[in-house]
Amino acid sequence: MKILVLNCGSSSLKYQLIDMNNEEVLCIGLVERIGIEGSILKHEKAGRDDKYVVEQPMKDHKDAIALVLEAVAHPEFGAVKEMKEIDAVGHRVVHAGEKFATSVVITPEVEEALKECIDLAPLHNPANIMGIDACKAILPDVPMVGVFDTAFHQTMPKSSYLYGLPHELYTKYGVRRYGFHGTSHNYVSQRAAEILGKDIKDLKIVTCHLGNGASIAAVDGGKCVDTSMGFTPLEGLIMGTRCGDIDPAILPFLMRKEGLDADGLDKLMNKESGVYGMTGISSDFRDIEDAAKNGDERAQATLEAYVKKVQKYIGAYAAEMNGLDVVVFTAGVGENGKAIRADIASNMEFLGMKLDKEANDVRGKETVISTADSKVKMLLIPTNEELMIARDTLRLVK
């Protein structure tokens, strides 16, 4: 069975075609600047070094997906001879609120439910829905599945997801912790159990998805019991441009002092904060590490604050689960930041985390980075959200 995995952003689209007989990626691609001048598709077929590139106007996601399907079935660069070889489409959907705790086959009722969640993810859900509609128009007979970033976290107990706010704000507007990166946390926790040869039901795992956006999850027996992101992807860790946890009273203070309105605050917290705002240098951790090595004190303090926040969450989740067996690092910083992983592991030996410095000297490769006698196993696992989406799609349409 061949499954097309789509991840639609507001002006971009990532895709992979995966042969589920052997979980082999047949082709991958990216469309950028949808609805903007300079639209471009970049497509790669497995086993080829050259790329197939198309630069032409794409007014909307329907135009973009039509070009994607042409590329997938291209006579030279395609991975199938004709579109009807695509057996199913798996869509990444950012926010399902409380409506879906697992992936679902997309029906008109599911689409209506997703539209009701637009207020919870105004930047992401409209693009996800546009991708679904475009696919239905071009591939009307192909089954489609929605895989939700929030679904994995729906197993959290109320004690983890309720905020200290008036209860009617939860009942009226759904104000609660939802969590994000769920597909990634799900994949790496399952993969960690496989690598260690353990039953995931017997493991207490903390998964650290450390990218430009970053979140941590407590996974007890294969189920998420807590996560650092909240009502939106802004809560939790210090991120590339997002502030993470701050005192909420800072916001009305800044509204008065800086004359900011709600949109101004939103921009400040989401686009101008995090390590970018703290250093004034970049949202790229490599740039900040270089500056820190060259004696930049703000860069040094920023990295220390970032590491300390990750350590706090690991410790808190170990306490919440009454134990800790595994810590997993994934995503851009987690997979490639050797020094940051080492700093996070430092001062954590009291929890049973002992880093193997030689094993940690690796980037982007599945590796056990803890010592043989470490009570808590630490692993580097590159995330694979596309494969997880394809697996869920296969399970539901088979």
Curated annotation (Swiss-Prot):
Q: Which UniProt keywords apply?
A: ATP-binding, Cytoplasm, Kinase, Magnesium, Metal-binding, Nucleotide-binding, Transferase
Check the record and name the InterPro entries matching this protein.
Answer: Ac/propionate_kinase, Aliphatic_acid_kin_short-chain, Aliphatic_acid_kinase_CS, ATPase_NBD
This entry's Enzyme Commission designation comes to 2.7.2.1
Q: Which residues bind Mg(2+)?
A: 7, 385
Compartments, as annotated in UniProt:
Cytoplasm
- Give the positions of the site Transition state stabilizer: 181, 242
| Entry binding sites for substrate | 92
Which Gene Ontology terms describe the biological processes this protein takes part in?
acetate metabolic process; acetyl-CoA biosynthetic process
Instruction: Identify the CDD domains for this entry.
Output: ASKHA_NBD_AcK_PK
Q: What does this protein do?
A: Catalyzes the formation of acetyl phosphate from acetate and ATP. Can also catalyze the reverse reaction.
Subunit structure and binding partners? Homodimer.
NCBIfam families cross-referenced by the UniProt entry:
ackA
In Swiss-Prot or TrEMBL terms, this protein is called Acetate kinase
The organism encoding this protein is: Clostridioides difficile (strain 630)
